[in-house]
Swiss-Prot record:
Main location per the UniProt record: cytoplasm
Family annotation (InterPro entries): IF-2B-related (IPR000649), IF-M1Pi (IPR005251), IF_2B-like_C (IPR042529), Initiation_fac_2B_a/b/d (IPR011559), M1Pi_N (IPR027363), NagB/RpiA_transferase-like (IPR037171)
Reported function: Catalyzes the interconversion of methylthioribose-1-phosphate (MTR-1-P) into methylthioribulose-1-phosphate (MTRu-1-P).
High-level lineage: Eukaryota, Fungi, Dikarya, Ascomycota, Pezizomycotina
DNA repair listed as a keyword: no
Taxonomic source organism: Sordaria macrospora (strain ATCC MYA-333 / DSM 997 / K(L3346) / K-hell)
HAMAP family referenced in this protein's UniProt entry, alphabetically: Salvage_MtnA (MF_01678)
Location(s), subcellular: Cytoplasm; Nucleus
GO terms (BP aspect): L-methionine salvage from methylthioadenosine
Name this polypeptide is given: Methylthioribose-1-phosphate isomerase
GO molecular function, one term: S-methyl-5-thioribose-1-phosphate isomerase activity
Keyword check for Electron transport: no
Site (Transition state stabilizer): C174
Pathways per UniProt: Amino-acid biosynthesis; L-methionine biosynthesis via salvage pathway; L-methionine from S-methyl-5-thio-alpha-D-ribose 1-phosphate: step 1/6
Length: 388
């Protein structure tokens, strides 16, 4: 596993890596309340659907562990916890992992057996169950990511019969690695596994405007891991596919997902849809890597997904560390500069939806799902319990 950690946790203490300071500075913020977690998620100091859910759950756990709940009965304790979870959910409603974590934790506290306990004992039992369930979300995520990496690499090997003489090149978008999860990553986890198994020739990552998760975070992870890699702007993908597909054996676009709905439509970072269209045009496989917790079987199509609108300043301004005259980077100094006329109108959706017709495979920790003869992704074959 990569030494990079977006989340450091021990019972009663949570630290979150401030990803806005990367790649030049490593700084962990202590997160001890739901309000601090909300701000951390909203300002994108932590991002990535799995990491968002983990931070929200663990922040509430830390808060409870440290005595924030003053309820005097189990009913009041559950009401308090519900309020904390509902508040945290609003920090990023697009991320289905967060919604699933909220549902799981609400069910957990309601399933606690309190018969024969005093009110004080029942309250403590509810809090203990909540904390343990939150910690299990963290532990399960790492195992999930490694399984996604293995299944994704296996599927690509089956498609291309990769050998030492025919290693593949892939492209990824946004950040889906250790910084977006508890470790290893989803889409970037597949790339790591390809590298570890000697199947990877090269990886390209997009800049991912306007928040630059690709240039700030994915490029940093790829370099940190020693994976042969190149950074491109979002607008260079078509030219890359046209000019270098054969030369570099570009085989796949591999992306993560904030939400995959029942028919396979996928919401992910803005710019994903255009990559899918380009990949289809150039005969390149398009893969989505996501845990089953990111699959929303209650939402039928991508048309129903709520798309978050981000601040205009993300397009018109940019911040960064100061580069000295000798080329060195001064991490103690950061400047914010205008890169557009501040009077211009701005449309800044945080996500887009890729229709299922452009997706070749959806890789989960339970296996890889491809479309059947009817052109549909049959998630019910993978997780029948969710369709009962």
């Amino acid at each position: 596993m990569s030494a990079l950690e977006a989340i450091k946790y021990s019972r009663g203490k949570l630290e979150v890596l401030d990803q806005l300071r990367l790649p030049h500075e490593h700084h962990y913020d202590e997160v001890s309340t739901s309000e601090e977690a909300f701000d951390c998620i909203k300002t994108m100091r932590v991002r990535g659907a799995p990491a968002i859910a983990i931070v929200a759950a663990l922040a509430a756990s830390v808060e409870l562990h440290n005595g924030s709940c003053t309820a005097t009965s189990p009913e009041e304790a559950i009401k308090y916890i519900d309020g904390r979870l509902d508040y945290l959910y609003e920090s990023r409603p697009t991320a289905v992992d967060l919604g699933n974590a909220v549902k799981l934790l609400k069910k957990t506290v309601r399933d606690v057996k309190t018969e024969g306990l005093t009110d004080a004992e029942a309250k403590e039992a509810i809090i203990k169950a909540f904390i343990e369930a939150s910690e299990e979300i963290l532990a399960k995520d790492l195992k999930t990511n490694k399984s996604i990496g293995a299944f994704g690499a296996k599927w690509l090997q089956e498609q291309y019969k990769i050998t030492d003489d025919s290693k593949i090149t892939v492209i990824t978008h946004c950040n889906t690695g250790s910084l977006a999860t508890s470790g290893h990553g989803t889409a970037l986890g597949i790339i790591r596994t390809l590298r570890d198994e000697g199947l990877l020739r090269h990886a390209y990552c997009t800049e991912t405007r306007p928040y630059n998760q690709g240039s700030r975070l994915t490029a940093f992870e790829l370099v940190h891991e020693g994976i042969p890699s190149t950074l491109i702007t979002d607008s260079m993908a078509a030219a890359l596919f046209r000019l270098r597909k054969a030369e570099e054996n570009i085989a796949a676009v591999i992306v993560g997902a904030d939400r995959v709905v029942r028919n396979g439509d996928t919401a992910n970072k803005i710019g994903t849809y255009q990559l899918a269209v380009l990949a289809k045009h150039h005969g390149i496989k398009f893969m989505v890597a996501a845990p089953t917790t990111s699959i929303d079987v209650d939402t039928l199509t991508g048309d129903e997904i709520e798309i978050e609108q981000r601040k205009r300043e993300e397009l018109t301004q940019i911040s960064g560390a100061v580069i000295n005259a000798d080329g060195s980077i001064d991490t103690s100094k950061s400047v914010r500069v205008a890169i557009a006329d501040q009077r211009i109108g701005v449309w800044n959706p945080g996500f887009d939806v890729t229709p299922n017709e452009y997706i070749d495979a959806i890789v989960t920790e339970k296996g890889t799902v491809v479309k059947g003869e009817d052109g549909r992704f049959h998630f019910e074959d993978l997780m029948p319990e969710r369709f009962q």
